[in-house]
């Protein structure tokens, strides 16, 4: 209406200079006004275009990332869901985000998320406790949050009191893909506790560095322990979230309860993807090679031999003082705080094999764990009656492997005995895969 009013009076004939000036003045204003009407939509479109680029900031940031992106690192996918909830976090030193390796806890606190409690697994929340050491409850110095140990004094499962006031639990821990790595058991107990207390569990999934193959004897549940709770092989070939789905799907939680899961998948990942862990998953797994050899070498924890604990190269050397004269390679385990205070064969020179130069491509080409070292060193050991200890059966998941080695069975014969249980597991596994 204003535009019409101006136009109506601006075009009136003018007989005086005053009216001419007024007319010119009005005409100039009309031209400016018309130009603004034409240009304004264009300006708006530019502004809107800029907003469309920068408004979804977090999505744009994610798209710039290349390669494998962990669930935790995709904050834009779950941050809104966390707002307004009281959060508990099952985390440790591996729970990091981005190239800066910021702890996911610290990142979420900075984003204004309400974290109420931290739950720490084996090796503790900061990952500085030795293998098997009891870890006590504490207060995190940086955040001031209570840290509840779920690996200490047989306290593996969060109690209703531990979970009081928690609306949502987050599980964000790096696994290495071996049945006897205890974070799997921690996950199971956390899922049971959440299911029993009607708490949803969000899993920020991470790659499995040994996820490219499945191998080993399937656990006989008669040998159920914290280093093996269910009928899966030593190398299970699952990520944490995939295993969580299996726990639900196979009814393996106590009383067959079902845990409500909310999974944030790993982006750009397949089971054949090579993955270097940004942080050591535990004090004695401090190299890519040790992580790849861990499923094979950890069986020596069930023997009298040293596998390098008490050195800076654990899981990369195996030996014993009694093997002097049969092997020239030697090493000496000592007490190392935060890694192994009381390692097997402490302060003794051990003779055996050096795996430092072992080509791990042998694993990816064969898709098999190595039994040859176990058979070789058993045969070389002079006191065979004391080679194995009771822990070996828990690690192997079966009484048969020890009997087979003692009976002189070949690796081929031993592997044949793992069927059909191993094939049945592989078929079952397919149902729970989230990645190709």
Regions found by a protein language model. Name each.
Residues 126-132, 202-224:
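Glycine-rich, charge-decorated loop segments at or immediately adjacent to ligand/cofactor-binding or catalytic sites
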Residues 267-346:
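Glycine-rich, aromatic-lined ligand/substrate-binding cores of catalytic
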């Amino acid at each position: 209406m204003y535009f019409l009013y101006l136009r109506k009076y601006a075009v009136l004939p003018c007989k005086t200079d005053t009216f001419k000036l007024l007319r010119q003045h009005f005409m100039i204003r009309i031209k400016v006004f018309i130009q603004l009407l034409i240009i304004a939509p264009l300006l708006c479109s530019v502004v809107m275009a800029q907003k469309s680029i920068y408004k979804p900031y977090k999505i744009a940031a994610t798209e710039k990332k290349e390669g494998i992106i962990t669930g935790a690192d995709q904050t834009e996918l779950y941050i809104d869901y966390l707002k307004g909830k009281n959060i508990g976090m099952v985390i440790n030193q591996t729970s990091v985000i981005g190239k800066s390796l910021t702890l996911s806890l610290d990142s979420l606190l900075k984003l204004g998320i309400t974290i109420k409690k931290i739950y720490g697994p084996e090796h503790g929340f900061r990952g500085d406790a030795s293998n098997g050491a009891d870890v006590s409850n504490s207060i995190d110095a940086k955040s001031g949050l209570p840290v509840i140990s779920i690996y200490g004094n047989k306290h593996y499962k969060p109690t209703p009191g531990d979970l009081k006031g928690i609306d949502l639990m987050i599980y964000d821990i790096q696994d290495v893909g071996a049945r006897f790595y205890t974070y799997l058991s921690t996950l199971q107990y956390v899922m049971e506790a959440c299911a029993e207390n009607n708490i949803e569990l969000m899993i920020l999934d991470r790659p499995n560095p040994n996820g490219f193959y499945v191998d080993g004897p399937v656990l006989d549940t008669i040998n159920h322990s914290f280093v093996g709770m269910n009928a899966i092989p030593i190398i299970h070939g699952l990520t944490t979230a995939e295993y969580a789905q299996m726990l639900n799907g196979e009814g393996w939680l106590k009383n067959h309860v079902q845990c409500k899961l909310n999974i944030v998948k790993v982006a750009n990942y397949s089971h054949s993807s090579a993955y270097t862990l940004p942080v050591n998953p535990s004090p004695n797994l401090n190299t890519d090679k040790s992580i790849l050899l861990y499923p094979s070498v950890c069986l020596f924890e069930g023997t009298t031999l040293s596998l390098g604990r008490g050195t800076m190269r654990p899981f990369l050397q195996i030996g014993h003082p009694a093997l002097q004269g049969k092997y020239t390679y030697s090493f000496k385990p000592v007490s190392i705080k935060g890694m192994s205070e009381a390692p097997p064969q402490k302060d003794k020179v051990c003779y055996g094999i050096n795996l430092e130069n072992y080509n791990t491509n042998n694993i990816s080409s064969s898709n098999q764990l190595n039994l040859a070292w176990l058979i070789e060193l058993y045969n070389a050991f002079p006191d065979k009656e004391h080679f194995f200890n009771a822990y070996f059966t828990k690690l192997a998941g079966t009484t048969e492997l020890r009997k087979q080695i003692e009976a002189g069975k070949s690796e081929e014969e031993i592997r044949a005995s793992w069927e059909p249980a191993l094939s049945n597991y592989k078929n079952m596994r397919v149902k729970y895969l989230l990645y190709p």
